[in-house]
Each structure stands twice: as structure tokens, then as C-alpha cells.
């Protein structure tokens, strides 16, 4: 797999072969992430999933392609078996293991995949503490391995649950919402500091669940190693109305200069 330090990278959050080909040709993306919801949104049928994964891996060559385990209710053995099948498809596949709050099953899966030298991307995390435990679980994994913070969903988690008096009453063991969990930017800063102070090169932090361009800027400014972005939002990074107007001014000036000939 291509040696990239992933200290400041963009991944494409998509399963569209067309979009992945387009953006990979620009040279700005260092990887691809996808999941079942993205595949459904992109119009894939069940029969198209594996062939599409193969195409994506070929397009990305040796850049990482994160593919998610398909059933969080499956047994440890079933999850490990599925992960091994994915790795047989292509060596640049990173297995996405969902954080599962109900028990320690995901930690067992992560450990077994590490023993098999299968790199992972621990996903669906909303708070600092989840990221810490996932980071410790994969600190000795093969590189590249990742942990993923869901930016917009983290905000939803705070607004809908963690700031609710009823939720706090029913889940006293979680404690009050702290400053580090008050915003995904704080979570990002906290996790990057945790990894640096611990001397951990693995994992790298991916920030996903990005809904708009402003969140991309916030995530990188907070220190995210990687931001994974949907094609439409990535395209919107190029936009500024003043840039459009400035280009029009320059074009008009050139046409005026040509008239002097």
C-alpha cells in the first residue's frame, strides 16, 4: 500500500465509481470510505456491491478503501470471517468495524483482526471517550488503521441526548456533558492531543459525517488527520462568489487587451 503519512488528507466518502474516478484523477484524495447507507444512496443493488468494491480498489490502486462490516448484530466469528473475505478482494481494503456500545464485542473483533494483520477503521463514534478506547484497541495494528468521528451526528448526539435532563437521569454513569465533548472540534483537538502525548503513530483520526464546507474547515483547523467528504460537498469547497466575479474581471481585462491589437 502506498506510503502516505495521512497527517492532512482528504478521503472521498462515496461508492460511486464515476465520482471516485473523477476525484482520484485530480490527485487530491488519498483514500475512499463507504458504508451500506452510501451504497444504497448511490443506487447499488446487492449483486453490484462486491463488483463495485473491486472496481473502487482497482481505481485507488494502493490507496486505502474502507469497507464496513454489514451487521453489527453478528457474532465475533461472523464479523472476523466477513473481514477476511473483504481482505481477499484487495490488499488496500481497510475493514470498518462499528463501535458497538452494548458490549465489548467490537473490541474482541478489533483484537482478532489485529492478530491477523488486518488494518481497521473503527467507525460510528460520537464522543471523545469512544475514540480513546478505540485508539487504545488498535494502537498496535498494522498501518494504516483509523478511528472515525462522525462530526454532524456527534452534534446531533449532544443536542438530542447528552444535554437532555431525562437522558442524564436515565444514564447517570455517563456523567455530565464535559467541555471536551461540547463540540466535535473539541473532540478532535482532544483526540489528537491524546495520540500525540501517548506517542501513538496509529491510529489516524478520520472526521466524517460532514454536511457542509464550513465543517471541513473546522475539522482541519481542529487538527483532524483526515476528513472524508461526499462528492457534492467536496465540489463546494471550490466555491466563492467573489472568485467567480474576479475571474470574470480578469477575463474581461484580457479581452480588452486583445482589442488593442
Region annotations inferred by a language model:
Residues 2-21, 25-29, 34-112, 116, ...:
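Active-site beta->alpha loop and helix N-cap motifs at the rims of alpha/beta catalytic domains
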Residues 101-111, 119-233, 239-258:
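Catalytic alpha/beta core domains of metabolic enzymes, predominantly
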Amino acid at each position: 500500500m502506498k506510503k502516505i503519512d495521512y497527517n492532512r488528507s482528504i478521503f472521498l466518502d462515496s461508492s460511486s465509481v464515476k465520482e471516485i474516478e473523477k476525484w482520484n484523477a485530480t490527485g487530491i484524495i488519498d483514500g475512499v470510505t463507504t458504508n451500506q447507507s452510501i451504497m444504497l444512496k448511490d443506487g447499488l443493488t446487492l449483486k453490484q456491491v462486491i463488483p463495485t468494491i473491486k472496481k473502487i480498489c482497482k481505481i485507488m490502486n494502493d490507496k486505502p478503501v474502507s469497507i464496513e462490516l454489514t451487521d453489527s448484530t453478528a457474532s465475533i466469528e461472523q464479523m472476523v470471517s466477513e473481514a477476511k473475505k473483504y481482505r481477499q478482494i484487495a490488499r488496500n481494503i481497510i475493514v470498518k468495524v462499528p463501535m458497538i456500545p452494548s458490549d465489548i464485542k467490537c473490541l474482541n473483533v478489533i483484537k482478532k483482526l489485529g492478530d491477523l494483520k488486518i488494518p481497521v477503521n473503527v467507525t460510528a463514534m460520537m464522543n471523545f471517550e469512544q475514540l480513546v478506547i478505540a485508539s487504545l484497541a488498535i494502537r498496535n495494528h498494522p498501518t494504516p488503521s483509523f478511528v472515525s468521528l462522525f462530526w454532524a451526528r456527534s452534534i446531533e448526539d449532544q443536542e438530542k441526548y447528552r444535554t437532555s435532563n431525562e437522558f442524564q437521569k436515565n444514564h447517570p454513569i455517563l456523567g455530565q456533558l464535559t467541555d471536551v465533548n461540547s463540540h466535535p472540534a473539541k473532540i478532535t483537538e482532544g483526540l489528537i492531543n491524546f495520540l500525540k502525548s501517548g506517542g501513538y503513530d496509529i491510529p489516524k483520526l478520520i472526521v466524517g459525517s460532514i454536511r457542509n464546507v464550513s465543517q471541513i474547515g473546522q475539522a482541519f483547523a481542529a487538527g483532524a488527520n483526515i476528513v472524508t467528504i461526499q462528492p457534492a460537498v467536496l465540489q463546494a469547497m471550490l466555491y466563492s462568489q467573489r472568485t467567480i466575479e474576479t475571474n470574470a474581471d480578469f477575463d474581461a481585462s484580457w479581452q480588452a487587451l486583445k482589442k488593442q491589437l
